[in-house]
Amino acid sequence: MTFTFTALLCLGLTLGLWIPVLTGSLPKPILRVQPDSVVSMGTTVTFICEETIGAKQSYLYRNGNLQRRVPKNNQKPTNKTEFLFLNVGHQNAGQYHCSYKSQGKSSDYSEPLELVVTGAYSKPSLSAQTNPVVTSGGYVTLKCEPSHYGHTLILTVEGPQKLSWRQDPQCNYYTENCHVLFYVGPLTSNQRWIFRCYSYETNTPQVWSAPSEPVEILVSGKLQKPTIKAEPGSVIHSGKAMIIWCQGDLDAEIYFLHKEGSHNTQSTQTLQQPGNKAKLFIRPVTQGHAGDYRCYYYSSAGWSEPSDTLELVVTGIYNYHPLMLSGPPSPVVPEGGNVTLHCTSHRYYDKFILIKEDQKFSSSLDTKYISSTGQHQALFVMGPMTPNYSGTFRCYGYYKHTPQLWSEPSNLLKILITGQLHHVLFLSVMPNSTVHSGENVTLMCWSTYSVDTFILSKEGSGQPPLRLKSKIQDQQYQSEFSMSGVTSKLSGTYRCYGSHDSSLYLLSFASAPVELIVSGPIRTSDLPPTMSIPPDGLQRYLKALIGVSVAFLLFLFILIFILLRRRHQEKFRKDDEDAQKGKELQLSTGAAEPVTRDRGHQKRSNPAAATQEESLYASVEDMETKDGVELDTWKPPEGDPQGETYAQVEPSRLRRAGAISPVVSREQLNTKYEQAEEGQEVDSQATESEEPQDVTYAQLCSRTLRQGTAAPPLSQAGEAPEEPSVYAALATARPGAVPKNKKQ
């Protein structure tokens, strides 16, 4: 029974397939197209006609006209036929049908299929008239404007649903401008809404223009909101590039960046693989990019909530007059105090804003006009100072109607907070704390604690402090701040601080203060002469200097050697003279023979001079012979025409006693000698007429003789003397007894 029922069922099904054929009614085929029913010009298109098995031929029609006929292969029966079109154009656009034949009968036509070819006209424009971000279930208004007057407009949505809206335009016949407003909705968060607009002529509805730019409507969903941040920061100078990061769910497929108030999506990024971060570029930044931004992401689960708002500020828009930012006399301030920063400009702005470089602090104030200076300014009071206030600051100007468009930045001002490192630092000055203008000074800051950077600050200077990396020497960290050619402006009180690289603006406690005093310049006469030597000649100069030094030392050595040798020779000569003198004294003492002088050759033409000279020799001879006075003589050098010179007279003993004439002093003898040298006349007659007087003798000891020639006076006849007289000036050693009443 069961078998019979199964056999009858199979027979019924088989008959069901062939009953339409037997009755002359073939099943209607189904027509499809690949890749899409809307394609651009030049695309390859394939039509597929699906029919029943056993069809002998298949037919394809466009606008009721046969386009293709394809016979079926009985060896390989199939239930579909493909019609291929290469490089389609606007002539291929239209309404298509297909049919087939089987057992000598034709089937009905398939349902119509429109093939739309785009790119025949210029593209229209499409924009959102309301915020392109809506909540789920909301509506949006899109405006489409054709590029050709009178064209019908069509709005399409990308996706499997193939939604579209057609509408004739509203045209202004005077301006020939046409547009259509499409009110679309409700929009759900379970799909993407990407719209495009086309235009076409009424008589050729399948030949469209090129598509407009896409407009995607973001539907705020319920997925977790992403985070948003900007690099290098949300305040950026015009013309530079920036990156906006949006981080969301791991299943995110695409990210969107939207600027509030804009009718278009600012930027999108489709991820090749699902991920939780997107990198959205804006380059170069212009003033049109200023504003508030949010980002979204879409995944298979729908849309996310919007991120927090990111305010993007574009600077450098107004650059007529630079802004100035000034602060306390020293940028180094203690923790807990208050600091006032002044932002000034010659140009009017509605507001000034003070911002920290890391953008963790900002404050804006209305500007005030200062009539005395002709400037606009704002005073920013910060305090009490904490580590959060340390860093670099700038101020900008802007107007209320464009709060995200700022001026050029002011100068950079650094604020350093002290007392953050409990290190002990020391500061010393070399060569001295008091120097002359133009000299070089070195301030050394050091500590036994680990310090990455030393900071040298001058009280009240208003200048940024000096920074130097520390160096380890002698088991201590130190830095040397060298100042060459100092002036009086560098006089003042200095302190040094230390910091770590991880927190450059957080400083240690200050070192003990050091006062530097720079006095007036050194006088030029006190300075040694200097010479500027070019760097390329320094090597030659050093070689020449070494050569001169060696030559000088060699010359000095030779000079010392000659002096020592000469001194040695003088010593031996003196010893020889002393020995010779001793021998002569011994000979003169031992012989005791009278000393006679041959005076025959010293005849004078002047009788007075001759008489005086004879008296002198006679006195000396008489002293030797009568009184027992010993006489020592030295022979003059050979060739001396003056003969012997009496050098020393030494009394042995006194033979007489009686009246002694006064001793003749050395001055009197010298006076007589000088008168003789000057050639003064001697009154010989007065000498001859006077009575003979006693001659006074003095014991003399002379080591050196001075010889002079005296020109005697002319004789009465006017004749010159025959030869000059020679006299010897004797130095008196000590007084002694002399003979009395010795006549000349």
Curated annotation (Swiss-Prot):
Glycosylation sites (chain numbering): 79, 338, 440
InterPro entries (alphabetical): Ig-like_dom, Ig-like_dom_sf, Ig-like_fold, Ig-like_Receptors_ImmuneReg, Ig_sub, Ig_sub2, Immunoglobulin_dom
Extracellular side: 25-543
Location(s) in or outside the cell: Cell membrane
GO cellular component, one term: plasma membrane
Segments forming domain Ig-like C2-type: 26-119, 121-221, 223-316, 320-419, 426-520
Residues that span the membrane, as ranges: 544-564
Motif (ITIM motif 3): 725-730
UniProt keyword Membrane, yes or no: yes
Residue window of motif ITIM motif 2: 695-700
Keyword Disulfide bond: yes
Annotated membrane topology: Single-pass membrane protein
GO biological process, one term: learning or memory
Residue numbers of Phosphotyrosine PTMs: 697, 727
Record text about domains: Contains 3 copies of a cytoplasmic motif that is referred to as the immunoreceptor tyrosine-based inhibitor motif (ITIM). This motif is involved in modulation of cellular responses. The phosphorylated ITIM motif can bind the SH2 domain of several SH2-containing phosphatases, including PTPN6/SHP-1, resulting in the dephosphorylation of the downstream protein kinases SYK and BTK.
Function as written in the Swiss-Prot or TrEMBL entry: May act as receptor for class I MHC antigens. Becomes activated upon coligation of LILRB3 and immune receptors, such as FCGR2B and the B-cell receptor. Down-regulates antigen-induced B-cell activation by recruiting phosphatases to its immunoreceptor tyrosine-based inhibitor motifs (ITIM).
Designated name of the protein: Leukocyte immunoglobulin-like receptor subfamily B member 3B
UniProt organism field: Rattus norvegicus (Rat)
Gene: Lilrb3b
